[in-house]
């Protein structure tokens, strides 16, 4: 809501309030008394300041004077007051003073503030039915029978709920609650019960009793790394705590303090504005209202003119919450009395126990009142008289001072403004012009000493990927830094006692602000420190020396073809030979005269016996020949397809054999983590107290558990750093388990090392910050910006690309499998099917001619021929008898041509001739 609108609303409110008051006042102005008396009982302490008027007493007078000057509220009536002072915790004196004021005829009693005195005065007011106005927190029992009081201080249950909502918004996973006295445990019940309902761990501590020295407690919390602390104490104690925390070095950006006092705005926080500390509190004073600002300004002017106070840590002239509550209380009583003008006030005596007859009526007017005062909206619970509906401003310390960052109300809960969401507590400007301590560890190529002919100092001593990353972050966020090497040279691991070492410990102890190194993000480290988003993703792999060449075995000539191919070739050989044998017996064109010079022979023979068929296939496979030549078309198809098949197989075998003979086969004894776990000959390990070691130590996978058992059983398996592990991998039979990025860098520069297998896991490198550091989010945003601009990839290429090892070719020849030459088997099968079809055609055609010539039935001829062909042992058979023949030279020549004599046989001289004889 804008300021002009608030001012207009205030003016309208004052106008209607005046009309409302006049409406009550005008009809019965004659019945209004000329004087209304109220009573105030205030405590004072012994010592030199005993007579100094406190803020509540001043506010009591200030409020009455404002009402008397503003005749709109009580036009014909003067508000007078009676002030009594008592010692702290003197309930007897408080009772006596209350009775004295009741005898004067007061319409209400204000105060006192302390518990025992308040209870004493409240019991008297309850007995005589006179309203008692309370201004401090007070524990009220559940079975509350005291009806004659109202309390303007916000209800403690609602305040505790506001603190819990703020803690949840800040996403605190742990916090420390520090209370001043036992009443603090009652006030913070809602928060203390939070661990049973929310995921938050609370530690409860108490401030020293009867002492303002909180340094021992602060020291203990600092040593315990308790950075999120909720203080339930008075504003006076809060000022002392802040001053002592500054002396203890706890006013830094890593700490976040929440104070439950509603007077945090009144403290002098000038010394802490630029400390970076996260300081959050609550405020009920409605300073956004112009009317309230005007009243507060008048108050400040009067306070500055009063005698100076000895109390330190407060701003001069500031209106405290108690004073604002008392101001509102006096106005509420005055307005309510104005609404009940027919009431009369008599002198009341405590010893008579005679109640004020208008007390109940007046008390109801007060409980039903609704007022917009200095502390905002004032509404009372009609049963308990407590203030349960109010608005709390959430205030936070910035470099410009305290700023309102949100509002909380019982109805709407916590509402953080957009400005606060964008800025947060000291985050936006927290890195600008700040000098940060950066811890790191030497690790190539992330952080290395720069090689130079001259002596280097400071940050110039270092170079590497992380150094370039740090420069880019500093350029984007505008901070300076100092690089320091971690003392023990370790990344950070937790021992059995829960103690950390390495860079993680330096972040926990706040010796460093950032850890910029190849620091792996793990859930164990996340419990101790905060991480940015990863700037590099990687995984664990195996570094091992390259294997030496192996001597070929005696049967290495079988390597060019895979075992499957050898088996299929053998089956093809057997199949083709058998099919050739069967088709040769069925095809009539494979039966011919055993002696071409004797065409009159009654028998024919077939050279493709079972053994000859196998011999023909073997000769073709060996590309040597067998002197067996198929004559029929079907058998020639088989022969041609088989020759084509052997051509492809032999050519492929010869080509791949040359590759196997010329390439030195490189075989590694291990190919994966499973191979490592199954053997004990090769020793393996990781860097001690590193993330890789922690991964195997915490893993629940059986293979990795077995590997960790091996590493933990041998002290020599774990190395101090990567350099030692790399050296062992080169000189001994040792495998180093390390991050893949480092392996990639090492193998680029050492050609004798290689990565074995793939990644065992997946993780990332992040920048570490202390728990609760406000720098983390800004660094994460900067890393994402570098990633989008591809600068992270450019930096990696710069530091990882080596000039040593050339790109390795895949020198290992692979055996030919069915995927590469399987087609030739399909062609062979198709050829066999075709030859069978042709053989069937030949068989049917020839037998039909024979049946006609012999004047037999076709079926009987086929049956006889099949019966003979199935007799596999016989290689000769009787020739079908033609008709009577006569010897003529023409017939002899024709017969010789049709019988297709073997090559060389045609030149043989024959002395006989046949001539057909026709009957």
From Swiss-Prot:
Catalysed reaction(s)?
Ca(2+)(in) = Ca(2+)(out)
Q: What is its main location?
A: membrane
Q: Which cysteines are joined by disulfide bonds?
A: 99-350
Question: SMART domains annotated for this entry?
Answer: Lig_chan-Glu_bd, PBPe
Q: Which residues bind L-glutamate?
A: 518, 520, 525, 691-692, 739
- Segments on the Cytoplasmic face: 585-636, 842-919
What high-level taxonomic lineage is stated for the organism? Eukaryota, Metazoa, Chordata, Craniata, Vertebrata
Which ranges make up the Extracellular topological domains here?
32-563, 658-820
Protein name (record): Glutamate receptor ionotropic, kainate 3
Report the locations given in the UniProt record.
Answer: Cell membrane; Postsynaptic cell membrane
What else the UniProt entry mentions is:
The postsynaptic actions of Glu are mediated by a variety of receptors that are named according to their selective agonists. This receptor binds domoate > kainate >> L-glutamate = quisqualate >> AMPA = NMDA.
Residues of this chain annotated as glycosylated in UniProt: 70, 76, 278, 381, 415, 426, 433, 548, 551, 752
The job of this chain, per UniProt, is described as: Ionotropic glutamate receptor that functions as a cation-permeable ligand-gated ion channel, gated by L-glutamate and the glutamatergic agonist kainic acid. Binding of the excitatory neurotransmitter L-glutamate induces a conformation change, leading to the opening of the cation channel, and thereby converts the chemical signal to an electrical impulse. The receptor then desensitizes rapidly and enters a transient inactive state, characterized by the presence of bound agonist.
- Which keywords belong to this entry? Cell membrane, Disulfide bond, Glycoprotein, Ion channel, Ion transport, Isopeptide bond, Ligand-gated ion channel, Membrane, Phosphoprotein, Postsynaptic cell membrane, Receptor, Signal, Synapse, Transmembrane, Transmembrane helix, Transport, Ubl conjugation
Q: What is the residue range of the signal peptide feature?
A: 1-31
Q: Position of cross-link Glycyl lysine isopeptide (Lys-Gly) (interchain with G-Cter in SUMO1)?
A: 887
* Recorded name of the encoding gene: GRIK3
